[in-house]
């Protein structure tokens, strides 16, 4: 159905001996960015993490900009769509969206990275965009409209992951029940005559949120607009 090209997920690329690969450098940089923020990713810090001299990294990335581009390229390398499968454009587009969401869930630094570099200088981003435009023109949109839709989908994925329900990022797991309790009490204490729906929302904080249900629902929501416009004839809105 959908080609997912394996990358070094979950920081699985290891540096052994003299074999310092481009993928290993990008993967370790991603680990730093995900755990400490993009500002923590410097050539000097990365070299220390990898146990090499800064000069060793210049073999793969000449400067910090190239390193950031390499990180984006590495993260998006699995975003592909195969037109030869014979599946509908709707299913193939959903696979693209779900894959992008999955990458962003695994690498929370990706949205910041995407806004920090010229994405069109990376092979994987251009390939993913080209594949998506092909799907959207197949759906009936013009190339220009397809680009608008693709931008909407990318920003929608960023918003979905950034707004996922639950406790604040980085909160220790043993503190999560208390955080949810306090949030529930806060909402329950709002004036019911003025904010009845907010008070009702409080009940949703009794248990851990169902993340898989949340992401499936949001993917449906995101794609429903595209499918609806395609069915109505996207190009008629020019």
What are these model-derived regions, one by one?
Residues 24, 28-66, 70:
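Helix-turn-helix
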Residues 74-78:
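Short, basic, alpha-helical segments at the C-terminal edge of helix-turn-helix-like DNA-binding modules
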Residues 1-20, 195-205, 234-238:
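N-terminal intrinsically disordered/low-complexity leader segments
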Residues 128-183, 226-230:
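Hydrophobic alpha-helical bundle segments that form small-molecule/ligand-binding pockets
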Residues 155-170, 188-209, 224-232:
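Amphipathic C-terminal alpha-helical segment
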Residues 81-127, 143-146, 150-153:
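Hydrophobic alpha-helical connector segments
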Residues 70-72, 101-121, 131, 162-169, ...:
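Amphipathic alpha-helical segments used for helix-helix packing
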């Amino acid at each position: 159905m959908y080609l997912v090209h394996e990358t070094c997920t979950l920081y699985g690329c290891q540096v052994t001996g003299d074999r310092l690969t481009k993928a290993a450098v990008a993967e370790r940089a991603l680990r730093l960015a995900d755990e400490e923020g993009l500002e923590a990713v410097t050539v000097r810090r990365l070299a220390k993490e990898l146990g090499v001299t800064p000069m060793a990294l210049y073999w793969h990335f000449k400067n910090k900009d190239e390193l950031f581009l390499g990180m984006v390229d590495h993260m998006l390398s699995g975003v592909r769509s195969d037109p030869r499968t014979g599946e509908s454009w709707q299913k193939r587009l959903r696979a693209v969206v779900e894959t992008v969401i999955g990458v962003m869930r695994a690498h929370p630094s990706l949205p910041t990275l995407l806004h920090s570099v010229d994405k069109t200088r990376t092979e994987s981003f251009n390939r993913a965009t080209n594949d998506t435009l092909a799907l959207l023109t197949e759906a009936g949109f013009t190339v220009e409209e397809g680009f608008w839709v693709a931008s909407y989908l990318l920003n929608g994925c960023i918003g979905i992951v950034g707004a996922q329900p639950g406790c604040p990022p980085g909160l220790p797991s043993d503190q999560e029940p208390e955080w949810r309790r306090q949030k529930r009490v806060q909402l329950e204490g709002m004036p019911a005559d003025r904010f009845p729906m907010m008070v009702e929302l409080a009940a949703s904080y009794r248990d851990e949120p169902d993340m898989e249900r949340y992401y499936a629902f949001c993917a449906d929501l995101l794609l429903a607009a595209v499918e609806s416009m395609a069915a109505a004839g996207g190009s008629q809105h020019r």
